[in-house]
Amino acid sequence: MRELIRLVSSAGTGHFYT
């Protein structure tokens, strides 16, 4: 579930991991 990681990362750091 890489999308979940992206969402959490985005919410936590402010940028997306692709």
Curated annotation (Swiss-Prot):
Keyword line: Ribonucleoprotein, Ribosomal protein
GO cellular component: ribonucleoprotein complex; ribosome
Keyword Ubl conjugation on entry: no
Source species, domain of life: Bacteria
Family under the similarity heading: Belongs to the bacterial ribosomal protein bL33 family.
Protein name according to UniProt: Large ribosomal subunit protein bL33
